[in-house]
């Protein structure tokens, strides 16, 4: 009996201990926490009641980087325009990490961002998703980016077709895009991914140049102001720069598709504010870029600023309407830009497949620009700047003095046996050549007919010339200006190919 009493007492002691522990460890803290929470809520309510409504309707986290072409985003005028539209924009410099930038749009960390079109395509392929869409064009590189090399080691683009040539550049940058455009369009079968030497930043590319020798087969792919610095060396020349082609190095504003669906008005207000600032700075971009560079701790001299501004084509309102297909004009449509860039990235192995599955139209959204145009949004009187595809005509002596740039990569043109008649299959090839030539409007084209060494050499040369002229006629009939094309027969080498060499008239 006594032992049972001891057991029962022990059990009750355990129960009391458990209740005491629960009271001390759970109930008391929970009550204290509830009191603290109530006090915190009361404090927050007091703050709300004694504050004011925010002047900002929406906040946008905008991801970008320090590129000089983005200086308008950092300007006071843009901030003021946003404020007038009750928009608060937080600019986030991510150091040009495009993959993380797109992931940020995907997750909701960012609502809008700046991209180059090629970087958007590559990043979309990398993450396997299309979380962002293009809503406006910022600018196009028109000479700001260039490929330089020593004249002795690399006299022209054809000399790049050498496995010993190395491209010193920054990965996932406009420099890489420029290199891939050249790889895609010229006969550079010996250039591969192993030819690329990626470095961390522009300063490292420039350092590699400073340490190189005139005999080195290095190509330095960079942008201003470094290009100007390298070209001060008389042994270095500009192999090609972005003023020679169009539609490949293009900066755009993108919006998260999720944010666009939820708050299209905010995206519209952002675009209107930006385009108004483009108009505001239309005559003072040099001053803006200079102050922007100084603020960033990288001041530029007057010559560097002039070349930098000259090399960037900031797109105004009417140019955006044209590029985005809101109104008809000769400016290149953004859908064609996207398709051309995708083709370059695939053909050079930068991406394995098209993330848009052959539908470039799903990568841009032109409804906002269409709506603001229909509502007569024009910040001021702006000109739609165009570039003529018509080069000045040359006489025979001038044609003979053209500086060769390189030989275009074109599949073999096939003719009916023993004639100059182009086959239907090769007409498809020539149609593609027409489109390619439209993206290189600043170069003349020499069509070179080669001939067999067998049989009657003179007859072979005559056929080679007639074949070159037949190709010339086809190009002219499909929109290529007669002033930029010349058909010739070269001294026979045994081949019966027709070759296409670009060139320019030296100053």
Each PLM stretch: what is its role?
Residues 117-119, 193-301:
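Pocket-lining segment of extracytoplasmic ligand-binding domains
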Residues 369-444, 501-507:
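Periplasmic peptidoglycan-binding/tethering modules of Gram-negative envelope proteins
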């Amino acid at each position: 009996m006594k032992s049972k009493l001891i057991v029962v007492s022990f059990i009750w002691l355990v129960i009391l201990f458990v209740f005491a522990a629960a009271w001390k460890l759970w109930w008391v803290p929970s009550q204290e926490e509830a009191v603290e929470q109530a006090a915190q809520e009361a404090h927050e309510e007091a703050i709300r009641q004694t504050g004011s409504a925010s002047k900002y309707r929406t906040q946008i986290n905008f991801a970008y980087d320090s590129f000089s072409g983005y200086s308008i985003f950092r300007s006071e005028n843009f901030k003021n325009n946003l404020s007038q539209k009750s928009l608060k924009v937080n600019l986030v410099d991510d150091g040009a990490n495009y993959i993380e930038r797109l992931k940020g749009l995907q997750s909701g960390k960012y609502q809008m961002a700046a991209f180059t079109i090629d970087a958007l395509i590559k990043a979309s392929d990398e993450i396997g998703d299309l979380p962002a869409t293009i809503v406006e064009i910022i600018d196009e590189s028109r000479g700001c980016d260039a490929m330089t090399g020593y004249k002795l080691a690399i006299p022209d683009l054809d000399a790049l077709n050498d496995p010993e040539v190395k491209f010193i550049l920054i990965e996932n940058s406009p420099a890489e895009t420029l290199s891939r455009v050249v790889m895609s369009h010229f006969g550079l079968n010996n250039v591969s991914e192993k030819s690329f030497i990626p470095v961390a930043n522009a300063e490292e590319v420039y350092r590699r140049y400073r340490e190189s020798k005139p005999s080195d087969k290095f190509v330095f792919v960079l942008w201003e102001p470094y290009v100007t610095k390298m070209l001060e060396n008389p042994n270095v020349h500009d192999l090609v720069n972005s003023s020679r082609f169009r539609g490949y190095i293009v900066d755009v504003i993108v919006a998260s598709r999720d944010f666009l669906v939820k708050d299209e008005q905010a995206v519209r207000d952002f675009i209107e504010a930006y385009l108004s600032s483009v108009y505001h700075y239309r005559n003072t971009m040099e001053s803006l870029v200079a102050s922007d560079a100084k603020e960033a701790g990288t001041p530029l001299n007057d010559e560097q600023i002039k070349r930098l501004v000259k090399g960037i084509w900031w797109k105004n309102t009417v140019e955006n309407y044209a590029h985005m297909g809101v109104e008809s004009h000769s400016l290149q449509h953004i859908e064609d830009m996207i398709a051309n860039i995708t083709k370059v990235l695939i053909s050079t192995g930068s991406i394995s497949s098209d993330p848009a599955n052959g539908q470039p139209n799903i990568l841009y959204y032109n409804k906002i620009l269409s709506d603001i145009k229909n509502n007569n949004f024009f910040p001021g009187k702006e000109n739609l700047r165009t570039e003529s595809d018509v080069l000045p005509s040359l006489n025979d002596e001038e044609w003979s003095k053209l500086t060769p740039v390189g030989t275009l990569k074109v599949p073999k043109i096939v003719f009916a046996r023993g004639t100059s008649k182009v086959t239907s299959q090769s007409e498809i090839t020539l149609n593609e050549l027409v489109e390619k030539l439209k993206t290189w409007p600043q170069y003349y084209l020499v069509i070179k007919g080669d001939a067999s060494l067998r049989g009657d050499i003179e007859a072979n040369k005559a056929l080679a010339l007639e074949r070159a002229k037949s190709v010339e006629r086809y190009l002219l009939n499909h929109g290529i200006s007669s002033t930029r094309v010349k058909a010739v027969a070269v001294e026979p080498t045994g081949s019966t190919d027709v070759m296409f060499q670009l060139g320019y008239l030296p100053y």
